[in-house]
């Protein structure tokens, strides 16, 4: 029986299947001149590629369609941008994850440059879109090292949904954890919980289901407590365990199944369709 030929596909479909972005997002990447095929910039949306022959890259990073999606977590240290490429040459998270081994790997959501902790990566574009969609209400847990100690009245403002410049934040789960010895021991490697400059400070646990830019910092500043350091240790069902700062690990089957349940996908169902032509 003759081997089946892999079907050439539209470039934006290839990018979506490689987990780079959604189909529409892939089109924007193309029209902005960030996509190359065999070293040549391609902006025409009708362009096709052969996954077995053509070399496709976005911002210089080669993309490919993996047989199975890849899922991993990084324990991000401070001082790295959550981007795959920085025009100014600053350190980025791409320096710490195996993009050469897993082409198409990208972060789901962002952490500020000075924020540490759990950052989830995948080649599964569909899962990424679902997890970031507001309707999924994916909870994220942070511990903030802040100047001063918020009062119960101030914490209640966060629990009720505090007004920010860009609109009200959804209600958050917050509590003071400064006296939690286990929490302080856990955060010691990140430098959280240490006093400095003679200023009184505290550790505040913050759990939110939104993902606005600088959201936790803005929320705490709105109650007059500046964030000195911020660390994230959960993202949905994922917990930052077994990963030293600056290192990564692949997710377990149980963790992937938990993510699939979070987005309403049957555990074990692969979003990657076969590349071979079907009759």
Segments (PLM) and residue ranges:
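Basic, flexible Lys/Arg- and Gly-enriched helix-loop patches that mediate nucleic-acid binding at interfaces
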Residues: 2-279
């Amino acid at each position: 029986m003759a081997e089946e030929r892999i079907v050439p596909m539209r470039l934006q479909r290839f990018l979506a299947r490689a987990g780079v972005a959604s189909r529409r997002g892939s089109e924007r990447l193309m029209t902005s001149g960030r996509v190359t095929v065999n070293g040549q910039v391609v902006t025409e949306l009708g362009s096709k590629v052969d996954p077995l022959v053509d070399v496709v890259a976005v911002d210089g990073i080669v993309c490919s369609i993996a047989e199975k999606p890849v899922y991993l977590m990084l324990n991000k240290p401070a001082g790295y941008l959550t981007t795959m490429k920085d025009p100014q040459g600053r350190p980025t998270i791409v320096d710490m994850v195996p993009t050469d081994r897993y082409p198409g790997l990208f972060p789901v959501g962002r952490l500020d440059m000075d924020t540490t902790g759990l950052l989830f990566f995948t080649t599964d574009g569909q899962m990424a879109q679902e997890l970031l969609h507001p309707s999924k209400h994916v909870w994220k847990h942070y511990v903030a090292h802040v100047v001063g100690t918020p009062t119960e009245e101030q914490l209640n403002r966060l629990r009720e949904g505090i007004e920010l410049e860009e609109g009200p934040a959804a209600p958050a789960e917050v509590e003071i954890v400064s006296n939690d010895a286990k929490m302080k021991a856990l955060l010691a490697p990140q430098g959280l919980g240490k006093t400095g400059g003679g200023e009184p400070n505290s550790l505040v646990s913050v759990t939110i289901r939104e993902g606005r830019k600088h959201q936790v910092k803005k929320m705490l500043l709105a109650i007059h407590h500046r964030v000195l350091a911020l660390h994230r240790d959960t993202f949905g069902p994922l917990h930052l365990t077994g990963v030293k700062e600056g290192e990564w690990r692949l997710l377990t089957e149980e963790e992937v199944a938990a993510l699939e349940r979070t987005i309403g996908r049957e555990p074990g169902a692969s979003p990657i369709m076969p590349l071979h032509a079907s009759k």
